[in-house]
Amino acid sequence: MDIRQVTETIAMIEEQNFDIRTITMGISLLDCIDPNINRAAEKIYQKITTKAANLVAVGDEIAAELGIPIVNKRVSVTPISLIGAATDATDYVVLAKALDKAAKEIGVDFIGGFSALVQKGYQKGDEILINSIPRALAETDKVCSSVNIGSTKSGINMTAVADMGRIIKETANLSDMGVAKLVVFANAVEDNPFMAGAFHGVGEADVIINVGVSGPGVVKRALEKVRGQSFDVVAETVKKTAFKITRIGQLVGQMASERLGVEFGIVDLSLAPTPAVGDSVARVLEEMGLETVGTHGTTAALALLNDQVKKGGVMACNQVGGLSGAFIPVSEDEGMIAAVQNGSLNLEKLEAMTAICSVGLDMIAIPEDTPAETIAAMIADEAAIGVINMKTTAVRIIPKGKEGDMIEFGGLLGTAPVMRVNGASSVDFISRGGQIPAPIHSFKN
């Protein structure tokens, strides 16, 4: 390695906000199933605090050793609806509290997996878990929740979509931060290291380490050096930069898995922004030549960015997964916030961008008087994009305040301007319930 590569790496960390966004330990709770919910809660607490006892210490040790910030240490677990279904309990808040207690004991930032997978219908535990979400998130600090309501193979469970519109409203009424920790998915993945949508899939190993990286500032700085050059050069620049970022993510993941004595899972090839200046995906798109994100050309710029991040990342790491693409959460990206405030970015353009990016309508504040059916219809639209295009889409929406207000979340969650929502009703559409069938191109066998 020559001195230029060393100085490049130092600059990435010190000047361009490069960091490892998260080391996430996935833990299977299938061996914690018990017909008594209190015994199940105790088993869950014991397993998490045993398996992840050293997660934070090892993360801090690696960060100090490599000189690379590791912002979050997190845990994801088996969807709790599967664990709770074995009990006779009528709500699963006690299991959420066990997760929260364990997370606080081991010192992690968040714990994900208060989740249900209902893309083709409800089982016993699913409906109970979904109805437990508002209280579970109001009465815990670190628990994150997700519900998968559709998939390319199964279609969209519109009954669950309607229920989640109501649940989001109830969650917002019960707590200020609960809705920021609740995601509704289509095509959810089993190895996602990012919150709030992480859960540990039943097909995963007993315990694994997944890593999520963050480096939009690094990509922007690289693109500054090729201003005015063709898209061929832009694409190659993004690809090479993504390679460097992912290589470091793989190194950190392998070191963590070796020291913790668990399997290494994947590196998520996502560009995850923060509210800090210089750490914005929106500013990367603007560096390609857009006056402001949201104008015409934004979706094309995002397509190039997303694809080249994947291409560079796949070359750098043989185990990739998670969501893997560019994140466009409004409240967590200062460039996105600015674009909403200046009027160039609206919900409709964000929806178009979600056909490209790795998530969906993420950390978007809408007026608190938005009907539950309208929120459900937003979820249905996002699910349709994901199901038809065979990709993950999601909704993490915040019904707070009135249009034009600024909602302050603090920390990595940032600040969200309350956006205008189409006022026409979707009530009759959402009230139909039932299942939107899987698309014809999903029929592969």
UniProtKB/Swiss-Prot annotation:
InterPro entries: UPF0210 (IPR007841)
Annotated coiled-coil segments of the chain: none
Superkingdom of origin organism: Bacteria
Pfam families: DUF711
Alphabetical list of PANTHER family matching this protein: UPF0210 PROTEIN MJ1665, UPF0210 PROTEIN SPR0218
Known partners and oligomeric status: Homodimer.
Similarity-based family: Belongs to the UPF0210 family.
NCBIfam families found in the cross-reference section: PRK05313.1 (NF003700)
Protein name per Swiss-Prot or TrEMBL: UPF0210 protein SPH_0352
Naturally occurring in which organism (per UniProt): Streptococcus pneumoniae (strain Hungary19A-6)
